[in-house]
Each structure stands twice: as C-alpha cells, then as structure tokens.
Amino acid sequence: TASTKPLLVTMLILLATSAALCWQTMLGGLAGLINMRRGNTADTMPAMAAVASILQCIMFLAKPEWYNPATLCLMTGPAALLLCGNAAGKAIDAHTIRDNFTLVSAGMDHAVAYRLKDAGVLRTVTAGLAEPRPNVLVSRPTRLMKGFLAGSESRRTSDKNQQQFARILLGCGVAAFLFTLLYRKDAGTAFTALAGVLCLGAPLAGTLISAMPMRLMQRSAAQIGAVIPGWKDIRLLGRVNVLQVTAQDLFPKGCITLRGIKPVRKEDIELAIIYSASMLADVNTPLKDIFLGMTGDNRKLLCKVENLETLDGMGYVGWINGERVMIGSRRLMDTYDIQLPSMEYERRHTVNQRRVIYLAVSGKLFSMFQVAYQSDPDTAAVLDSLRRAGLSLIVDCDDFNCDEALLQTAYNLPVGTVKVLSGKEHKALEPAVAWLPESEGNMLHLGSFASFVGGLEAAAGAAEGEHRSSMVLSASVLISCILAMIMALAGGLAGLPLPALALYQVAWAVLAMIFPLIQRY
C-alpha cells in the first residue's frame, strides 16, 4: 500500500548503503559461494542475508499487496546488524596488523622463527629424538621479516568451517522459501522466510571469533617483543614439535657458578684466571660470565688472544704471548695429548651437576676449574609446560660441558626429548640459523628464550581461543537452521519479532566471545 512504501524505500536505502560500505564483504562472500576456488571466507553468510533482505524489500515494492506489516517482518535491520558485526571483526584485524607492523618495522635487529624445511638437515639434527615426525622450529637473527603483510592477510582457521555452513544455511533458506511458496501459496511470506532463515542462521560473530583472539594474542606477544603475523603462521607454529634452543637459553646468568680452582702450581692461580677469562671474553658462551666475574669485569686485565679457534663440543684453542692456550673438556685435552688426572679423579668432582674445565698452556695442564649447573626456576616452569605440550628440544650448544645427561638431570627431562648437537650437526644447522638482512618466518621475536617461547604460547592461546569459539559458532548455525526450519513449517518465521531476533544473535555472539576473553595468551 502507499502508506508502507516510504518505509520500504527507507529500509532498502539504508541496507543498500550498508552493503555498499561493506562492498568487499558482499563481493568476497558471494564470490566464495559461487566460486570455491576463490577460497574460504567468513563473509558469505552475512552477504547472503543482506542480499535476501534487499530482495525482500524489492519484491514488496514491486508487489505492495504482498506486504502486510501486521504479519510480516522486514529483515533489513538484522541483515545490517550482521554486516556491522562482520565489519567490527575486520576493524579489529586492521588495528592488530597496524600495531604488528609498527613492531616489525622498528628497524631493530630481531630474530625470526621458521620451520626447518631442508630434509637432510632435519634428519641430521633430530636423529636420536623420540619424535617420529619432527617439525623443527629454528631462529635466525635478522633485521627485516619478509612476507609480513601476506601473512597478516592469510585465511582465518574458522573460515573453511563457516564457508561449509554457508551452503547448509542457503539450502535451508531455499527449502523454507519453496515450502512456503508451494504449500502456503504466499509469495510475500516465502521471501520473508528466505530472508528470515538467512538472518537467523548467519552468525553475528563470524569474523570476531578470529579477530578477538588475534588481538589479545598481539597484545600479549608485544609485551615480550614477539609478533605472529597471521593465522597461517599460527597454524604452522601449532604443528611444531621440536624447538631449537641454546645453552644460554637453558642456563641464564647466575645458573652456572664456580665451585673451585685447582691450579697445578698455587702461585699460578691469578694467571690461570686471567688466561681463562681472556680465552672466553669474546666467545658467545654462558661460561664467560664466571671468568670475567673473577676479574671484576675489568677487561684491562685480559691478555690479547690470537687465532682463537672454536672446537664444537670440546672447547677453545688460541695463542697468548706466543704460548698455545687451551680451555675445554677432557676430550679437547685428549685430542692434543695433554696429560690429565685419572677419570676416577674427575668423576669424584663431577657429581650433582658439576663439571670440570681444564686449562692447558704450552702443552701442559695449567689448572682445573670446577663449575656447578643449577636449574633456573622460570626456565624449569617453561620447559615443564613445553614437555606437557609434547615439545622436544635440540640444543645448539655454546657450552662444551653441556650434554643430554646434564639437561635431563637439571630439568627432569625425559630421555629422548632433548638432544645436544655435535660439532658436525652444529655445522649442518649453521646456515639455517645464520644472520640475514631479511628473512621469511612465522614469528618475529627479540632472540631471547622468553620472547621465543612466549610468542609460541601466545599463538597457542589464540588457536585454542578461536577453536572453542568456532565450536560455539558451529552450534549456533546448526541450532538456528533447525529452529528456522521448524518455524518455517509452523508458519511463525515470517512474523518473528525483530528485537527477539537481535537479542538471539547478540546472545550467541557473547557466548562465542567468552572463550577468547578467558583464554591465557
């Protein structure tokens, strides 16, 4: 009738404007429904609801006699609400990407974590672990992370699920339309039933269930200097079961202490300390803090070391004042035929996580140092969490004393879950962890153990939060489809009160959002 035409025109213009503002959602959603190659998307269900509601208004304008305001509800309001929910999720995503980009483009040296893909290196460094199908996450220092924007725009994990439900929802809508049209012989009610099914079944939180966990993950990870670009990276990090770490990660400063010095001649004790500190001063090893500490961190006391050579897993060889100086393990001394005390003597001094460091000068034993390794409480808690999550460790060792037995004892790690790389294995892995000016990766971090593991935990929290929300969303779509079909058969769908429909959608959205909000990141 003439009295309803202004209302229909107004509602049509408002919904069409909303759809135009969300044109990417409309285009992507409908294209995803028609062309499966375009990829999965969470835009299809709100786009279908908007199209059906626009079609409802157009049909009522074309056939005014079909529209009875007393018995039929216009679905333009719920459809616009669904588009707003979709846009809200995308706005949160945009803020997350912006904040991540600020961290990534800071121009600082970082490290990128990525999955080791070289099959040969992978077999070499994981041989001996109990993990049958190792997926190793390694880190390399870099200045720029490549592919950040592409990773940020990757498909959400829940998109595939929502795309499948979109087809189910459309089938229910078409079935309700045909039943109402053929059984009740009422075209106006049939178009209302179609729009009603799609507006009732489409989730308000379709993009929010991914955007909210990603946002909360970003905030948590940023506090420890970590950045995970997008859902593709979260999924890949979730498949990792082996982490590459260093001895410095496992034994931070203060965990290794000096328990005794036994020079061959007592008068050489000061020289033994200076020689040892000089040899380790410029080496990346947790042992150097002990010896530099004995000199009061006064580098003026140190001697110049020439031709310093690192022998992986054994120690260091260099020249001081024309004399060859060696500091390291028994194996290093045996390699150069240095006369040492008996193994029985060494065993008496290597109980309770203690180790002996030998210093030789000019081919003769000069001094012995006894050091003790203690577990770090924070590191122990992290390793226990990793163990319960099924993660193993490969230790790219920068401490010649560190071995599997020491780590298993210090941190109560099961046999087969930790491996210390040999010199050959270290060389095989070295190109994969060497510095590059720019590198692809799945996570950017500060290079510290806390930032590395904290980023992994944040990503795992986001994945778990989205998974639980996705289960709620799936239940909401299925229950809504069943309710919509029952109401369509009973003839009550066309007259569904709009406030009730809006509250129904909001209730499901709130329920879905609870899980990301209570999830630990």
Protein language model features and the residues they cover:
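Transmembrane helix-loop junctions at the membrane interface of multipass transporters and ion channels
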Residues: I54-T71, T180-G188
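Hydrophobic alpha-helical transmembrane segments
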Residues: L14-T25, T76-S105, V112, A130-V242, ...
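ATP-binding catalytic core of ATPases
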Residues: L149, S158-D159, K262-D312, D334-Y336, ...
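Cytoplasmic-side transmembrane-helix entry/capping segments in multi-pass membrane proteins
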Residues: N35-A47
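Conserved ATP-binding TGD loop and adjacent catalytic N/P-domain core of P-type ATPases
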Residues: P134-N135, I320-G322, V361-Q505
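Asp-based phosphoryl-transfer active-site loop
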Residues: D233-G260
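Signature of the cytosolic headpiece of P-type E1-E2 ATPases
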Residues: L7-M11, A62, G296-L406
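C-terminal ends of transmembrane helices
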Residues: W23-L33
